[in-house]
Amino acid sequence: MSLHITSATEGQLQVHFTTKQKQYAVPDVPYSIRANVGCSELNTLLGTVLKDAGNKQGAKVAFDFLLNGEFVRSTLSQHLKERDISFEDTIELEYVERYPAPQPQDCLLHDDWVSAVQAKDGWILTGTYDNTVNLWNTKGKHKLTIPGHVAAVKGVAWISLNEQTGVFASASHDQTIMIWEWNMTTNTAECVHVCKGHERGVGCIAVNPAKTQMASGSMDTMLKIWSTELQADKGEPSATKKAKLEQDNVRTPVVTLAGHREFVSGVQWIDNTTIATCSWDHTIKLWDLSMGGIKTEFTGNKSFFDLSYSPLNGMIITASPDKNLRLYDPRSKHGNFVKNTYLGHSQWVQTCRWSTTNEYLFVSGAYDNRVKLWDYRSPKAPIFELIGHEDKVLACDWSNPKYILSGGSDNAVRVFKSRIAVDNTKDD
């Protein structure tokens, strides 16, 4: 199947197939193929090569193909022309097992809009516009409704979980964050701390990797850091005041960081001393807690509604009202922080979350009632669209690798089972 190419005008290309998934490797020889082939024809060819090599299992697998780190979503000739790549060059095509489609598993109905959701192990936390926090298991059973807030719950975050007890936090437009302790034996939840200090509604919270602190963003433009310890408070000074606050179970912030000019709409921990925030003021800021200030700042053209950081690849994905998601690399040294733009939604993109186990994948939810699953190597189109919501998608989560969750103004949490493709890309 190795041929000499005499002219690019013949519509032929010379390609090498390569993969990091060793169980699907083929001989490293050049193949002469038509330039106008797409993924379907490439799969047929690769299946034949695998079968001829005695890999009957591999011959049944569907693959996606990458050229220079980007998925091929058209014919090879069109892909090359759009990127001004010479037809005379030998093309190296990397192939990876196609990620299997997530399957709809459940619909968890609430009494009002679902504006926050996060899973941990077999449990799902939700926050709603009827001021409550709800607990579900991943089998779809509702376990507990927790009243306490006096305005919409806009953020939920697990702090710890064992066989007897769960500890989690909820953030609300009532300007407070509540830390809850859930007794699984009695199926009751007690508010052990009320975190007060924001002067307007709290829109987002996140817990650090060590589970010792949490960060919150608010309409008051402030970023605040709180202790998650259930014992002694480590709040701001004033011994008399502090004693009274502790007596009332009220917690004050460890640190308050000013810098944003509008609503702090998203917060994520990079590590235990670095926090990323986004805001309606068109900026993303990286904060260094050890020095108590801003380390890096990126400015965009639109407001940011949400962001998600991946420790697997070191990059940040953002959601914005211009229907786009953007990929940022905060490690960039030359000021070009935006690595790619993803257009696939038809209305405001409200929420986004990285996979916790696959460095390439993330999900997004938007006002077009759609949840989309993306591979960051495929900027022109999502790899799957997860259909089910009948109104705006307000929150999404992929904390548990098995489940993609989304909450919306249709009062529902949609649960999709995420089937994991075989991945042997890492060396033993």
From Swiss-Prot:
Residues 13-97 are annotated as: Ubiquitin-like (UBL) domain. Keywords: Nucleus, Repeat, Ribosome biogenesis, rRNA processing, WD repeat. One of its GO terms (cellular component) is PeBoW complex. InterPro entries: G-protein_beta_WD-40_rep, NLE, WD40/YVTN_repeat-like_dom_sf, WD40_repeat_CS, WD40_repeat_dom_sf, WD40_rpt, WDR12/Ytm1. GO terms for molecular function: ribonucleoprotein complex binding. It is found in: Nucleus, Nucleolus; Nucleus, Nucleoplasm. WD repeats lie at residues 109-146, 148-190, 197-236, 259-297, 299-338, 344-384, 388-426. CDD domains: WD40. Signal peptide: none annotated. Its main location: nucleus. It comes from the Eukaryota. Gene3D superfamilies: YVTN repeat-like/Quinoprotein amine dehydrogenase. GO terms for biological process: maturation of 5.8S rRNA from tricistronic rRNA transcript (SSU-rRNA, 5.8S rRNA, LSU-rRNA); maturation of LSU-rRNA from tricistronic rRNA transcript (SSU-rRNA, 5.8S rRNA, LSU-rRNA). Required for maturation of ribosomal RNAs and formation of the large ribosomal subunit. HAMAP family: WDR12. Belongs to the WD repeat WDR12/YTM1 family. This is Ribosome biogenesis protein WDR12 homolog. It comes from Anopheles gambiae (African malaria mosquito). The lineage of its organism: Eukaryota, Metazoa, Ecdysozoa, Arthropoda, Hexapoda.
